[in-house]
Design a protein with these regions (language model features):
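Conserved N-lobe loop of protein kinases adjacent to the ATP-binding glycine-rich P-loop
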Residues: 67-74, 81-85
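Activation segment signature within eukaryotic-like protein kinase domains
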Residues: 173-174
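AlphaC helix of the protein kinase catalytic domain
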Residues: 154-165
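Conserved short submotifs of the Hanks-type protein kinase catalytic core
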Residues: 139-153
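Activation-segment/catalytic-loop signature of the eukaryotic protein kinase fold
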Residues: 135
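Protein kinase catalytic-loop region centered on the HRD/HxD motif
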Residues: 178-189
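Protein kinase glycine-rich loop
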Residues: 52-58, 63
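AlphaC helix of the eukaryotic protein kinase fold
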Residues: 91-122
């Protein structure tokens, strides 16, 4: 008999996995979403976030799909995980640094990560800025929970639409993004990573 973990889908969080495929949302088990440094699916963070599949890893962090067990909503969890400073992850989820000589740099970066989450939380309601719902420390590092954006990024949009449609969408978005960046800069923050991959378009535009 399958265990609850084997039946639970890491995307829709329904007990609908059969033979590696979710009978509810259609998700097919993807081994590429289980990296050696990723937290295990269905780990629990901050006593209320049930982790699902990993959505990707950048130079400074790993993003996971998650479910808020208090209200049942899905969200994204961003983990502070600078790959140049972290050597590995321990079995209990704690991060292990490449060396104690990097401790100060890691802690400084972690505090900036938390401060940025706190600042972005103050911008909730701005349609061009993702809502930050929570932030906390655990496993020797830091995390923040943000709203799940259902849609695609600008690069994916470009592949599926003609140049005129892409240009109109990009122009509309640049006006919103410019306004949002002005607010972010007012708080003394610099994004530093504006790219088509990081510009998200919701399903309703």
């Amino acid at each position: 008999m399958a265990t609850l973990e084997e039946k639970l889908c890491p995307v829709c969080f329904q007990e609908a996995m059969e033979g590696g495929k979710c009978q509810n949302c259609g998700y097919v088990l993807d081994k590429a979403s289980v990296g050696k440094n990723y937290l295990r699916s269905f780990s629990i963070l901050n006593t209320k976030y049930l982790l699902g599949k990993s959505l990707g890893q950048g130079g400074f962090g790993i993003t996971y799909l998650a479910k808020n067990m208090l209200n049942g909503s899905r969200c994204c969890i961003k983990e502070y995980f600078p790959s140049n400073l972290i050597q590995s992850r321990m079995p209990d989820g704690t991060v292990a640094l490449t060396g104690e000589e990097n401790r100060c740099e890691f802690e400084d970066g972690k505090q900036r990560f938390i401060e940025e989450a706190r600042t972005l939380q103050e911008l909730r309601g701005n349609v061009a800025v993702v809502d930050i719902q929570d932030f906390f420390e655990e496993n020797g590092t830091a995390y923040f929970a943000m709203e799940l954006i259902e849609g695609c990024n600008l690069r994916a949009f470009k592949k599926e639409h003609n140049e005129e449609q892409t240009f109109k969408m990009a122009l509309q978005m640049l006006l919103l993004i410019g306004s949002a960046l002005a607010e972010v800069h007012r708080f003394g923050m610099i994004h530093g990573d504006i790219s088509p991959e990081n510009i998200l378009i919701t399903q309703n535009g």
